[in-house]
Amino acid sequence: MAKNTKLWGGRFEGTVEDWVERFGASISFDQKLAKFDVIGSLAHVQMLGQTGILSLEESEKIQVGLKELLEELEAGQLDFDIANEDIHMNMEVLLTEKIGPLAGKLHTARSRNDQVATDMHLYLKEQLGYVLDKLAHLKGVLLDLAENHVATIMPGYTHLQHAQPISFAHHLMAYYNMFQRDSERFEFNQKHTDLCPLGAAALAGTTFPIDRQLSSDLLEFKQPYTNSLDAVSDRDFILEFLSNASILMMHMSRFCEEMINWCSFEYQFITLSDTFTIGSSIMPQKKNPDMAELIRGKTGRVYGHLFGLLTVMKSLPLAYNKDLQEDKEGMFDTVETILNSLDVLAGMLSSLQVNKEKMQESTEKDFSNATELADYLAGKGLPFREAHEVVGRLVLDSIKSAKNLQDWTLEELQTYHSLITEDIYVYLQPKTAVQRRNSLGGTGFDQVEYQIAVAKKANEAKK
């Protein structure tokens, strides 16, 4: 029987069949962790040298070899072998080829269990910084757009029906606030990613006199995990990221859904740049909002990664199980998806054309000013419920007569209630309706300008 040549093969008599090897290998995707695997190893071997577990000479030689591997990796000169299963074994084999048997001492006081957890913490910690940078850019684009459209009036909707006229900037600031909370969630995610698993070993720690705080400091983590079982067995920091990413994608998807509607012939509220639209292979006139549709579609993809990992984790006993190999691809794909989606959405918003006249016109052909009349009557002392009923009858009669509220004469309006006077026509104007809603957080122009000013100050403080 052929000898098992795996680095862990001493206990085995038989060899692994090629097809089984392919099924179990993860190098096709976990090579994304290569840089972080080397960085983690550099910190580990430096700690081994400083604590006397390895001699300083041994530590230095291993560090030189690892740094050479890092240079070759960055130059695209490393080749990985599926026979070595994963990025950790591949790197150890490559290091052995470079410096000989001394490479075997690198794994002293370390397991692949704490090694892979460390790699993923390092990877996600870096990526969260990129996500937050792109979110900050998107929020800046939104603020610039909102600042230019405080006085642009559009219909506000409930149930996709015209409800009340609002400032377009007010609508944009609603999304700004959603994205701001997304930023805060990712910032909190950073706290849980900023923990160092290195030194937890397989599950129970190690008998070697390691210095876990030193390893943590060298890798610029805030602190080590305080429980070795927890360090190697949980992936809640990834689940938290996937959850936050799902909420972010949901917010982007809702925004894209609205832009898809707004650029349709029925709305014509906005015109998207050619850069973010696609033509039809058969219909020459088409200009389809494909990029917005793709963000909307990719939202389901990110949801899938969240539920996939939740399902992987739901029945896992402590500590490490091979199921955890399935924690990586969804994380990698989600990172790529949200970074690209943030870029595309920011690009669409910074280049879109707002058709102010269409938005304004849409508020003049509906009954979204009906609440103004009800508030007007309530302000004159009529109980709001009674005012609501009066205006409801007027709206019904207006529909039957093909009129808008402002089309009725004063005498006709007064047949509905004597409290209505000449000044009602000012109140029924969409601009007045918007301007008067100056309660905190409302759509009144002063309030919207205040919201923008506060948001810009907060955004600047983050830079």
Swiss-Prot record:
Pathway: Amino-acid biosynthesis; L-arginine biosynthesis; L-arginine from L-ornithine and carbamoyl phosphate: step 3/3. GO terms for molecular function: argininosuccinate lyase activity. Its EC number is 4.3.2.1. The keyword Amino-acid biosynthesis applies. It catalyses: 2-(N(omega)-L-arginino)succinate = fumarate + L-arginine. InterPro entries: Arg_succ_lyase_C, Argininosuccinate_lyase, Fumarase/histidase_N, Fumarate_lyase_CS, Fumarate_lyase_fam, Fumarate_lyase_N, L-Aspartase-like. CDD domains: Argininosuccinate_lyase (cd01359). It is found in: Cytoplasm. Keywords: Amino-acid biosynthesis, Arginine biosynthesis, Cytoplasm, Lyase. GO terms for biological process: arginine biosynthetic process via ornithine; L-arginine biosynthetic process. GO terms for cellular component: cytosol. It comes from the Bacteria. It is an enzyme of class 4 (lyase). Belongs to the lyase 1 family. Argininosuccinate lyase subfamily. This is Argininosuccinate lyase. It comes from Streptococcus pneumoniae (strain 70585). The lineage of its organism: Bacteria, Bacillati, Bacillota, Bacilli, Lactobacillales.
